[in-house]
């Protein structure tokens, strides 16, 4: 089966919709997380992904990203200072979900998400941390490339790790990931492939223009 993998949508619904026009519904659609924040349409993106998974339950795989992870900390009241979350795209996400939002009512907004958008929050909370398909290891951020067994990677590292690709890939698998914009790695937005061809980054930085 062919795979169609999309990374780091970040609320850019129009671009996401355009990309989906190239998806053959016979192929497996894999969403690498970071569906929310930064762009104006986080709610619409989440709704679209939920609808796709409901319509094609065997053809749509959804992974969690670090931005979904931050959202869970926010709605669960585990975030001591929400400022970094809010200035890193969280406020755009809140505006997308909550109309007539009071941006100063941080705790109240979290409660609205938990109560009025429980289905969306549960969907994001229950997204996978990784997906293995044959010789492909598909993650949001990467994996612990210093561990003897990649499956010992913490959930935190699957979502947040940086520069794991600087270490040799000893898994025997090809790791496809996002999280780090490819322009930070080779100064262009095209996919980046490591010299050993066992690491592939597909985060084209759509939300950055």
For each feature predicted by the language model, list its residue ranges.
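N-terminal active-site segment of His-dependent metallophosphoesterases
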Residues: 1-48, 52-54
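Active-site glycine-centered loops adjacent to acidic/histidine catalytic or metal-binding residues
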Residues: 8, 34, 65-66, 179, ...
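Residue-level marker for buried hydrophobic side chains located in beta-strands
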Residues: 5, 29-31, 62-63, 137, ...
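Short, glycine/acidic-enriched loop or turn micro-motifs at the edges of active sites
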Residues: 10-11, 37, 69, 143, ...
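Acidic, His/Gly-enriched loop-helix segments that form or flank divalent-metal centers
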Residues: 95, 100-209
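A general structural motif
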Residues: 25-27, 57-59, 134, 171-173
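Active-site neighborhood of divalent metal-dependent phosphoester bond hydrolases
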Residues: 38-128
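Short glycine-/acidic-enriched loop or helix-start segments at secondary-structure transitions
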Residues: 16, 41-42, 72-74, 148-150, ...
């Amino acid at each position: 089966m062919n795979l169609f993998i999309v990374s780091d949508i970040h609320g850019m619904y129009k671009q996401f919709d355009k990309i989906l026009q190239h998806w053959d519904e016979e192929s497996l659609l894999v969403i690498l997380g970071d569906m929310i924040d930064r762009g104006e349409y986080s709610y619409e993106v989440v709704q679209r992904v939920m609808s796709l998974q409901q319509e094609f339950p065997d053809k749509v795989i959804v992974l969690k990203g670090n931005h979904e992870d931050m959202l869970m900390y926010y709605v669960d009241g585990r975030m001591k200072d929400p400022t970094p979350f809010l200035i890193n795209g969280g406020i755009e996400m809140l505006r997308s979900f909550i109309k007539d939002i009071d941006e100063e009512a941080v705790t109240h907004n979290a409660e609205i998400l938990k109560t009025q958008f429980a289905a969306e929050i549960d969907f994001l909370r229950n997204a996978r941390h990784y997906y293995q398909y044959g010789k492909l290891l598909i993650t949001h951020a990467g994996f612990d490339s210093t561990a003897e067994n990649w499956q010992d990677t913490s959930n935190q590292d699957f979502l947040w790790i940086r520069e794991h690709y600087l270490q040799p890939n000893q898994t025997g698998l090809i790791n496809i990931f996002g999280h780090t914009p490819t322009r930070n790695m080779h100064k262009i937005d095209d996919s980046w492939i490591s010299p050993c061809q066992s690491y592939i980054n597909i985060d084209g930085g759509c939300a950055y223009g």
